Amino acid sequence: MRKGIWGFALVAIVLLMASCSSESEYANAIPKDAAMVMSFDFKTMAEKSGINGKGGEKVVAKLTDALKSGLEGEAYKTAEKIIQNPSESGLSFTDKVYMFITPHSNAFALLAKVDDEGKVEALLEALKNEQICTELKSESGCTWTQMGTALCAFNKGTFLLMGSNKGDALSLKGSLLSLMRQDAENSYVKTTDFGKLASAKGEVVTVMNMSFIPNDITMQMRMGMPADLKLEDIKYLVSATFEKGKIVVDVETLIENKDLIAMYEKQSAASSCIKGACLEYFPANTLVWAGGN
């Protein structure tokens, strides 16, 4: 388990240290029925955080030291090399990085573009030697391996890391390989939701519908809602922008169901904007506050 965590940690570090790349078709691997899709602009996030400048040198040093306690031998040398030069990972993170969740949260995945297939393979071979992932296998035009409770696959353009809420990684193999060879016509990229995701401003942008909620919770949500309502009809676009000292979050409803729109309008008519009359009673050091009227 601890070995698997270091595999995920290395990917996370590379995300914030990434370098330039060009467009590709890797987003075709997002399933058309994805319940939640998030896009991450790690290039802008890294620029705003200052991690690539002089101020980020201490952070990089701490990340390198942290890896020393979790990786050894060739895996550590590879990780250290990637931190110094992220392109050595073979992955590109100035193209958008995506995370998606399937309906009822049955599976979740991280998707990135591959710049150099050979370097990705070398990275995973180093992790395999540390028993962080299993033997690499070639099948259906890609290479795949198991990393803890997740499966990882890559080819010359796509890197896909996929896990299940049931913890049975191998049960995802069929879906993983199918998504790796999926074309645009059968992908999320051909939906109007993807167009809104791609055009929205923000370092982290999410399009989601309520079908991502597990089955055992959805029954409670349906109370008081139209009988013919589909959870897929309840959709939101959420964008987060990182500014100095704050994170600005914008939420937009993408609901098209007329009955549901009427219900929301009725609820909105019974509420009003918060005037802030009670703010003076909050302590000056309040970390989070919320209110409704």
Model-predicted regions and their roles:
Residues 1-9:
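Bacterial N-terminal signal peptides that target proteins for export
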Residues 8-17:
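Bacterial N-terminal signal peptides
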Residues 9, 147, 239-243, 292:
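Enriched - but not universal
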Residues 20-146, 185-231, 247-293:
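Structural boundary/hinge residues at secondary-structure and domain interfaces
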Residues 99, 151-156, 227-245:
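Broad, structure-driven detector of short, well-ordered beta-strand segments within folded domains
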Residues 144-178:
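A short, solvent-exposed beta-edge/loop patch
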Residues 166-174, 220-238:
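Extended, charge-rich low-complexity interaction segments
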